[in-house]
């Protein structure tokens, strides 16, 4: 998934390297900061491991506005995941190894992240088998379009002072964000399925006007076993 600045928010290559980038809500942004989109692109195109890449990044973290970056190396026998944030308010700068299992990440430590992680876990437990692939995709897409408001959320209120008590502030509290009056909101959904044989199904829905366009790609990972 590409960003407007030539980088990417999410990327996966056939060697099993995956990266996802989240911006964070922050009150004070750096002027002339470097584009964060290249953090994803450079990891996927490079040869560094998840840990090596983030360790290298630690030395230049201050030239970017706030972000969270998840890097994953996937093989048929293992999954290596690391997480880095340069945002001090979220206990950063922090570099962590992530254990296998269900993990939820968001633009901040919001209620919708915790509730979303629970619902995601329930869906995967119920449908996370190859026999239920179509149902799994359907339920995950429904989850990504979940517009329930998790409000009031004290952390969200603290980080969105420009919208005190407004409907827009409340709309930030849902998984699926939609603000037509501001031409702002969720524009892309991505679901990536990888089985034990390295077969990949990459589904992406992107909003264009009022239409959601769906693209599906399949491939096989060439990661080392």
Q: Which sequence ranges carry the predicted segments?
A:
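N-terminal nucleophile
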Residues: 1-225
């Amino acid at each position: 998934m590409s960003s407007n600045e030539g980088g990417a928010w999410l990327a996966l290559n056939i060697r099993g390297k995956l990266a996802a980038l989240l911006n964070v809500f922050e009150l004070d942004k750096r002027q002339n900061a470097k584009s964060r989109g290249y953090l994803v692109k450079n990891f996927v195109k490079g040869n560094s491991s998840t840990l090596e890449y983030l360790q290298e990044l630690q030395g230049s973290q201050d030239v970017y506005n706030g972000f969270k970056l998840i890097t994953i190396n996937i093989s048929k026998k293992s999954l290596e995941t690391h997480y880095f944030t340069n945002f001090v308010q979220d206990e950063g700068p922090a570099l962590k190894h992530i254990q296998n299992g269900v993990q939820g990440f968001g633009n901040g430590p919001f209620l919708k992240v915790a509730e979303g992680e629970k619902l995601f876990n329930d869906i995967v437990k119920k449908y996370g088998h190859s026999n239920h692939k179509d149902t799994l995709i359907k339920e995950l897409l429904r989850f990504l379009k979940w517009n329930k408001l998790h409000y009031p959320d004290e952390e969200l209120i603290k980080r969105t002072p420009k919208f005190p008590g407004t409907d827009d502030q409340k709309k930030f509290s849902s998984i699926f964000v939609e603000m037509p009056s501001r031409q702002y909101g969720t524009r892309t959904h991505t679901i990536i399925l990888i089985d034990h044989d390295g077969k990949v199904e990459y589904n992406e829905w992107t909003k264009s006007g009022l239409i959601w366009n769906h693209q599906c790609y399949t491939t096989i990972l060439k990661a080392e076993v």
